[in-house]
Amino acid sequence: MKKITGIILLLLAAIILAACQANYIRDVQGGTVSPSSSAELTGLATQ
């Protein structure tokens, strides 16, 4: 049972990372340097 939970957690982490990466790539391609609302929602630290 513990192994299944670990696999589910790994899948969730991968999905969240992929979503963050997609948002970042989209923002960069859009040419916006200012932090976007999506970055604030995901909790990314913008400097």
Curated annotation (Swiss-Prot):
Lipidation (N-palmitoyl cysteine): C20
Entries under PROSITE patterns matching the protein: PROKAR_LIPOPROTEIN (PS51257)
Gene for this chain: lys
GO BP of this protein: cytolysis
Domain of life (superkingdom): Bacteria
Lineage: Bacteria, Pseudomonadati, Pseudomonadota, Gammaproteobacteria, Enterobacterales
Chief location of this protein within or outside the cell: membrane
Signal peptide region: 1-19
InterPro entries: Lysis_col
Protein name: Lysis protein for colicin E9
Keyword Lipoprotein: yes
Location in the cell: Cell outer membrane
Lipidation (S-diacylglycerol cysteine): C20
One Pfam short name: Lysis_col
Gene Ontology CC: cell outer membrane
Keyword annotations: Cell outer membrane, Lipoprotein, Membrane, Palmitate, Plasmid, Signal
